[in-house]
Amino acid sequence: ATMKQEIPYSSAQLLYYAWQLSRNRGGADDDKLTGVLSEARVDLNPHQVMAALFAFQSPFSKGVILADEVGLGKTIEAGIVISQFWAERKRRILIVAPATLRRQWSMELEEKFFLDSFILEKKKGISLDHLSDGKQIYICSYQFASRQAEILSRTHWDLVVYDEAHKLRNVYKSTPSMASRLKSAFSDSHKLLLTATPLQNNIEELYGLVSIIDDHYFGDLKSFKAQYCYSNKNDDIAFGDLRRRLRPIVHRTLRKQVTEYVKYTSRIPMAQEYYPAVEEQKLYNQISEYL
């Protein structure tokens, strides 16, 4: 099913809102994000404004999935959300990301949003007092979060951000996994899932991602399959119903929707296959485990 969020404003209006959020000082209650971004060093695009507003659409929401295509700035969108939580003094914030992206996240937060962060690593250990002090944003790898899930769960996180959240897509399976440990550890926290590929192999993966946010959103897996996988309904009707159900929790922007104001460089990709030697793969696995 294609998840496509309708944009109720013209491109000119969205450009104005993007400028307003980026440049204005202060702001009334109606302009929720204006004050947060008044000092942020970032040029916003209209679709990023829409994504940030979507994330705050309901005070009762347990979280959302931002599923823009690659290259549309999901990190910036998450930065806006994180900044708003920080401004509201909801400062127990954890970002779970691939190990290779932790430094990038730290730099983005500092350079674009002036937010301090600390990367949790095995060699540094964990202090529960520090995790709860709300003085900085914490960043860790998926492997670290999985290994330290019990300790991390003792902090009531105001916001947990999952970058490359498709890594959690198989959480619906009955076998214990990294995804199931993280789901349990942060079940009570507000969550923001970032992924360009919310659906890769089968529709159950979409069920899994949504269950990370709200375990009861679609009911149990058996009911979900009966309604959307093995339904007697016409496929168009079933997928139409699924899109309607996903609309409050999943926001997706496609590249073709933003070509009016985002100019892409024409590239000719060349793929070069590489197969690591046994020793190289072993070293890579050991470093990943250490991180």
Regions found by a protein language model. Name each.
Residues K4-L53, K74-E77, V81, W86-M178, ...:
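SF2 helicase/translocase NTPase motor core
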Residues S189-Q200:
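Conserved helicase ATPase motor motifs in RecA-like P-loop NTPase domains
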Residues F54-S61:
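Phosphate-binding P-loop
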Residues A1-Q20, L206, E279-L291:
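Charged, low-complexity intrinsically disordered regions
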Residues S61-V81:
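Walker A/P-loop
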Residues E69-V70, E164-L168, A196-P198:
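Conserved Walker B
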Residues Y138-W157, K173-D188, I212, H216-L291:
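Inter-lobe coupling linker of SF2 helicases/translocases
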Residues P98, T195, A277:
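Conserved phosphate-coupling serine/threonine residues in phosphotransfer and NTP-handling enzymes
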